[in-house]
Amino acid sequence: MLMLLSPSKTLDYETPATTDSFSIPEFLEKSSELVKVLKQKSFLDLMELMQVSQKIAELNVERFNQWKLPFSTENAKQAVLAFKGDVYTGLDASALSENRLTYTQSHLRILSGLYGLLRPLDLMQPYRLEMGLKLKTKKSENLYQFWGEKITDKLNVLLAKQDNPVLINLSSNEYFKSVQKKNLDGRLITPEFKELKNGKYKMISFFAKKARGLMVRFAIDHNIQKAEVLQNFDYDGYHFNLELSQVDKWVFSRG
């Protein structure tokens, strides 16, 4: 079983890492190609490309200009500890023991516009580059074209090592478009999280994001190896809703 998350825009490079263990991203050569393009952009270019404020654009001009190889614990941080959005609030990786971080390294991957596919302990330098951006390079019109088959091929290598290859998609639509799901060599399961509001079950983005992280944490806490066991997920009042679920679309609801 392999779980897949989106990254977050919010980053934390102030809090010291809670582990000395780390790995190096596998697509750094491709990341370097993107950074080379991004270093040529002004803050005005980034404001238009990313649709962000001048302050955020200037911050990312600085980030891309400071981005350099090789990565070390002096100039980079483990991805699962650096990301700090709603998903990662639910995951709360800084509270994980070394053994549990080892589990994440085998069972979790994080999609990234800049790094392609990250292991949780992969070192990364700070950036902002959403997968849906139309960043042009010499050979591609956008990041989906840039990454092409690479992310899917890597996921297939990982799935091939499993007895029952299953990918649990806990990423957003924007990021999962970078995966060519028709070419996946395994079963694809997409959990959804819904709240009961005015007599109807609805997906509310803030709660759903946190729940994705909570599901990963549930898998870590219970050392889950088989996807079906995730149907026991019960953190924060959620439960598996058989009535709303389909074969490969599992709905968890509360309220």
Question: What kind of feature is each model-predicted range?
Answer:
Residues 4-95:
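Active-site helix-to-loop segments that bind/position phosphate- or nucleotide-bearing substrates
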Residues 93-246, 251-255:
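Internal, well-folded beta-alpha domain core
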